[in-house]
Amino acid sequence: MSHSSAPERATGAVITDWRPEDPAFWQQRGQRIASRNLWISVPCLLLAFCVWMLFSAVAVNLPKVGFNFTTDQLFMLTALPSVSGALLRVPYSFMVPIFGGRRWTAFSTGILIIPCVWLGFAVQDTSTPYSVFIIISLLCGFAGANFASSMANISFFFPKQKQGGALGLNGGLGNMGVSVMQLVAPLVVSLSIFAVFGNQGVKQPDGTELYLANASWIWVPFLAIFTIAAWFGMNDLATSKASIKEQLPVLKRGHLWIMSLLYLATFGSFIGFSAGYAMLSKTQFPDVQIM
């Protein structure tokens, strides 16, 4: 097949001619397109990690705004996003070859607005039942699954010799969302930045106001911005299309299962400890202001 129409096809939302291993193609167009997709993917993934870790900052503060949940219940809220996120990573890993990286990144980023908005309203009403928080925490797990689809998507854009660096940037900078959440949340909950939406602060013993809804609402405008950026700025690669049936043979590879166990022990521990750190610190040092 002739590649004479490659320049036109490489500029649309769907790219039908993609040859990252071809040095000439890579230098002329491939590198620019791949870099653009990478640098839109990074903030989308970072925001996903922020949403994934929402309850690491929110659960520890629920008693301060009038909720009488037990310590075990609060720990459960911090753990459930990791559970649903881990389970959802399996189907999410198959989504990019089916729907395309642009479509899936925009969709999977946009739906994270739902738990963020819902949680913001839920924490302002002390009659909100625990079951609602359970549902919201499980929905936050969708954010954790984004890691699987995001990494799969970026790998298609780069030649093999550059995939390590690209995936390192995407995953490494994306993981910073854990730290960003735990840095930003304690700052924004002290500010009345969403009063126009009816966000009322709760008076604390030291005289300050706690605006817990801010911990989730602060991410909504950024999620909206980067959902739009993903839709209009990223690309779908026709060459990466594959049905679930075509992808299943990878499950027969022993190295996949060995790497999965190593990943569970390393990254799984990182996420688990990060999610529960604030609650654990509060139970061990109750007199210390954690968040």
What are these regions (language model features)?
Residues R36-F69, M181, F273-A278:
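Extracytoplasmic
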Residues M1-C50:
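Cytosolic juxtamembrane N-terminal segment immediately preceding the first transmembrane helix
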Residues M76-F94:
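Central cavity-lining transmembrane alpha-helices of secondary-active solute carriers
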Residues G144, G164-S190:
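Glycine-rich segments within core transmembrane alpha-helices of 12-TM secondary carriers
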Residues P115, P129-A145:
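Hydrophobic core of transmembrane alpha-helices in multi-pass small-molecule transporters
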Residues W52-V60, G254-M291:
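Extracytoplasmic gate region of multi-pass secondary transporters
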Residues G110-T126:
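C-terminal ends and interior cores of transmembrane alpha-helices
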Residues S190-F194, V220-S240:
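C-terminal membrane-cytosol helix-exit motif in multi-pass small-molecule transporters
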